[in-house]
Design a protein with these regions (language model features):
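Surface-exposed, low-helix, low-complexity loop/repeat segments of extracellular attachment proteins
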Residues: 1-33
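Extracellular jelly-roll beta-sandwich "head" domains, especially the C-terminal globular C1q domain
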Residues: 32-184
Length: 184
């Protein structure tokens, strides 16, 4: 296919204007992809509940794939760019006491509890492990951070990590996992 007039050039506008994100070389237009921010953060260690009914901030000691999002101070998942983000978390909860205990899990944005983000989980009797996950979508300002908080009145409640196992060989399981992805 041939054109009498180029689509665009660096000196003249054709059918389109070269601007941010677009380049033109000999009539060929190229656009860069806008890579959104993302991050995967996890903890390979158990996290205890040393004080009943106190706020525990989930800590992270491992970073997976990430772009524009990082961990600050071990607990704050911090974004470079403002935007709408979706957060997905998974925890492994356990307890060693009898009866029913409640673990509350919620989100903080820049140190302030996020309304509507709490979920409660009943841990019944002495149970080995229970997995739970949740998600939340929110606007985060540039330089802002989120934290995954949890609490329980029962000090035997922990976020537990699984060791590697054999017969058959199985990998470790981390106590907390969070994926944060910018969606706009």
């Amino acid at each position: 296919m041939a054109y009498n007039t180029p689509l665009t050039s660096t000196t003249e506008f054709g059918s389109m204007k070269v601007g941010t994100g677009f380049t033109s070389t000999n009539g060929t237009v190229s656009a860069t992809l806008g890579l959104l921010n993302y991050g995967f953060f996890t903890s390979s260690i158990p996290q205890t509940n040393p004080v009943a009914n106190a706020v525990n901030l989930s800590t992270f000691n491992l970073t997976g794939p990430a772009n524009g999002i990082s961990i600050v101070g071990g607990t704050a998942i911090t974004v470079v760019n403002a935007g709408t983000y979706t957060k997905l978390f998974t925890i492994i909860a356990a307890k060693t006491s009898g009866g029913t205990s409640v673990i509350s899990i919620w989100l903080r944005l820049n140190g302030v509890d996020v309304v509507g983000s709490r979920q409660d989980l009943d841990l019944i009797n002495t149970l080995s492990l229970i997995f739970t996950s949740g998600n939340f979508t929110l606007d985060i300002p540039a330089g802002g951070n989120i934290q995954l908080c949890w609490s329980s009145a029962d000090i035997t409640v922990v976020l537990d990590a699984l060791p590697a196992a054999v017969t058959p060989t199985r990998p470790t399981g981390n106590s907390v996992k969070v994926t944060l992805t910018r969606i706009s």
